[in-house]
């Protein structure tokens, strides 16, 4: 079992999608549940969002800041981390597997702080491992209103 904590982000406006992505159904199962189950190799799992949905039973942490940006979720995850490393995921990855997490984890080096995949020449910042030591840099970027 990986000692990292997992934080799944269920926020955003889902403008193009039309409804909250985490509530979408794939193969008779909520997308969030697909991701949650793929993360069962980790010791601690949490969901992060602006407000806890009604009848929500998974461990939930409210966004630490009043802003709409993924950096808020990452900041919240790192502030609440129970381990040095966190796996930060968006809620729109229903096909993610433990093998992908293992591959990412094995690719980290001793001197790295972030491990994120690259797909179609784009970095996937809401699917990666982040070390707690980046928190001061993250706080600095938030103070400067650099949210990307």
Whereabouts are the PLM-identified features?
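Nucleotide and nucleotide-moiety/phosphate-recognizing core
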Residues: 1-147
């Amino acid at each position: 079992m990986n000692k990292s904590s997992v934080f799944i982000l269920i926020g955003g406006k889902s403008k193009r999608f039309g409804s909250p992505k985490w509530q979408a159904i794939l193969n008779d199962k909520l997308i969030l549940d697909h991701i949650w189950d793929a993360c069962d190799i980790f010791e601690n799992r949490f969901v992060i969002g602006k407000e806890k949905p009604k009848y929500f039973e998974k461990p939930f942490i409210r966004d630490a800041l009043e802003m709409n940006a993924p950096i808020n979720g990452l900041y919240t995850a790192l502030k609440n981390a129970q381990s040095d490393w966190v796996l930060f995921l968006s809620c729109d990855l229903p096909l993610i597997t433990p093998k992908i997490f293992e591959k990412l984890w094995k690719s980290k080096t001793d001197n790295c702080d972030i491990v994120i995949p690259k797909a179609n020449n784009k970095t996937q910042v809401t699917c990666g491992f982040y070390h707690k030591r980046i928190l001061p840099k993250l706080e600095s970027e938030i103070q400067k209103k650099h949210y990307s």
